[in-house]
């Protein structure tokens, strides 16, 4: 696995482990910072995953591997490329074969190149246009720029099924779940495991994750009693925050979502 990663990163990954990628302690720079632009400028463009990694590797490392935690979308791009390198199949095929089909999911998929729409009935998503300052419909977009870091499409009920079946040992082994839950405490997330966040709720620890793409944000978790909740909103915090560049303002915009998660899982 390490040899495959070293080939993908053209030698830059010789000291980075898969665990560090999953736990965001790799030190890889954020590719979205390297290609930062308004989604309104690139919504119709297809981007190749390899280009994202190249853009990230053109920048200096954020820190030495294993030194600290910093959530970085680049880690998921590398993991997606690593899956394709090792299996000789596309990421979408692997997700379908290993997750979607075994769980009988009908509305969960990784969009194919050029697919800019959400299949079936769906809510519209909105993003603040930096030019006009207004919230505008951004539902139709090419999600390739997020790829393994956030391009998946699903429904709330199927996300709940996925999370429950992963954490109860149906989809992966109990030992793998235990490894995923070996976490480190962070300033920005309660506890971060291997692609899992441990949320400290009023009724105990809930395990889940979530994600954002312009126009949509999700937060999901499985509570101590095995119940699952997924919350979706149709604008990300930076789009509705009073100060889109201020951390406190963004955090305040996200807080009601976290409170709703606690209320739904704990009945508080």
Language-model features: locations:
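Conserved hydrophobic/aromatic "anchor" residues
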Residues: 1-4, 162
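Active-site micro-motifs of SAM-dependent methyltransferase domains
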Residues: 3, 7, 101, 237
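Short, surface-exposed loop or secondary-structure junction motifs
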Residues: 9-212
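A short acidic/small-residue loop/turn micro-motif
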Residues: 143, 236-238
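Short, surface-exposed beta-strand/loop micro-motifs that present aromatic residues
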Residues: 206, 215-228
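Residue-level structural signal for beta-strand termini and adjacent loop
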Residues: 210-212, 219, 234
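Short, gly/Ser/Thr-rich active-site loops of penicillin-recognizing serine hydrolases
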Residues: 239-268
